[in-house]
Amino acid sequence: MSKVSDLFDVTWEDMRDKMKTWREENYRNSEHVIEVGEELINEHASKLGDDIWIIYEQVMIAALDCGRDDIAMSCLQELRRQFPGSHRVKRLTGLRFEAMERYDDALQIYDRILQDDPTNTAARKRKIAIRKAQGRNSEAIRELNEYLEQFVGDQEAWHELAELYINELDYAKAAFCLEELILTNPHNHFYYQQFAEVKYTQGGLENLELSRKYFSQALKLNNHNMRALFGLYISSVHIASNPKASAKMKKDNVKYATWAASQIKKAYQLAGRTMTDTQTSLKAVEDMLETLQITQS
């Protein structure tokens, strides 16, 4: 097999820097990581200094993604020799067991880590990930709630809990989690969009109004958010057709829906898709606009 350095005329420093970039950007093209990482380890280990150990870890995780347990085990053995007793290396052992679906073995490792260090967030999160992988969502929810009592600022955990509640159709609790995220991330359009989707799913005029407002805010923060634009359209349409809505509310929401539909039409025209796709999409939007005109009349 040809070497990466020969194929692309790059130096070992280039490959080292590329591995660093992939780590920092959470790049998940695992086959590339293995290819570049293995060449660095096999051909340039003496030049890498302490960087060699993070590359071993990076290659190991990529190997687990690709089902290459032989490579993963080789990297893990090197890390164990260098860092005997390290909690980080023990967690990597747990990840290998997870990849092999040996969940009980992985849980034993994470429990031992937590006995030594109850504040080890990585081990606690892996336990929760195992509950999810096993389909034991109620246990994952319980453990996430316990975790957030101690680490209330962990935004990733709040979002994971929201997703679990959505999967369990517990929309009120999902909305609470998303509100927590909005409070700490008031400029993140995705959280507004997701909160709006939850309120829309809950239904009822009050929730629909909240849904429309949060879709609107998501669009203000990111005017390219097509999902929020469609959300604004559909929530406005449902409010306009709700028998409990006042005449003014209906009129206002027809206006919002008409605006959203016109923006959707513009977006399709600018998207540069194939003519057939564009014509089909535009016909759907024109039907939307025609429906609104009928409603308004």
Swiss-Prot record:
Xref: Gene3D superfamilies: Tetratricopeptide repeat domain
NADP among keywords: no
Keyword presence, Ubl conjugation: no
Membrane spanning stretches: none
Topology in membrane: Peripheral membrane protein
Entry's localization field: Endoplasmic reticulum membrane
TPR-type repeats, residues: 87-120, 155-188, 192-225
Biological process according to GO: protein insertion into ER membrane by stop-transfer membrane-anchor sequence; tail-anchored membrane protein insertion into ER membrane
Signal peptide positions on this chain: none
Subunit text: Component of the ER membrane protein complex (EMC).
Protein family per UniProt: Belongs to the EMC2 family.
Function: Part of the endoplasmic reticulum membrane protein complex (EMC) that enables the energy-independent insertion into endoplasmic reticulum membranes of newly synthesized membrane proteins. Preferentially accommodates proteins with transmembrane domains that are weakly hydrophobic or contain destabilizing features such as charged and aromatic residues. Involved in the cotranslational insertion of multi-pass membrane proteins in which stop-transfer membrane-anchor sequences become ER membrane spanning helices.
Name of this chain's protein: ER membrane protein complex subunit 2-A
Organism, as annotated: Xenopus laevis (African clawed frog)
Organismal lineage: Eukaryota, Metazoa, Chordata, Craniata, Vertebrata
